Design a protein with these regions (language model features):
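N-terminal leader/targeting segments
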Residues: 1-35
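Generic marker of residues within folded, mature protein domains
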Residues: 17, 35-37, 81, 92
Length: 107
């Protein structure tokens, strides 16, 4: 019970801080990593989804909808303007594996 609460809470906070819409319904392999203590908090979210669903999700999310990604080989990096008091938010998409990584933190 505690682990599922931490996962759900971390996902919710990371989505708010990165200003991202709910994950695509087709998302698989969800992994939520939480770090920090009372004065810092960091979240890293990983999941996979089909390419068309990822593009739709990125285009419908306030954090990425108007951004041009930095392309690095087969990866796209979106440097998102963080929300809800966060200091950093970034979304990376690996186009070879369809892996998405949302990384955000507050300090």
């Amino acid at each position: 019970m505690y682990r599922s609460h931490v996962t759900a809470n971390g996902l919710e906070v990371a989505q708010k801080w990165a200003r991202m819409s709910p994950l695509p319904e087709t998302a698989t392999g969800l992994h939520v990593e939480t770090r920090g203590g009372p004065f810092t908090r960091e979240f890293t979210i990983r999941f996979n989804a089909p390419p068309d669903d990822l593009d739709s999700w990125l285009n419908s999310s306030p954090g990425t909808s108007n951004l041009k990604p930095v392309v690095n080989g087969r990866s796209r990096v979106y440097n998102v303007e963080p929300g809800n008091g966060a200091m950093h938010a970034e979304v990376t998409v690996d186009d070879d594996t369809n892996l998405v990584v949302i990384h955000t933190y507050w300090s």
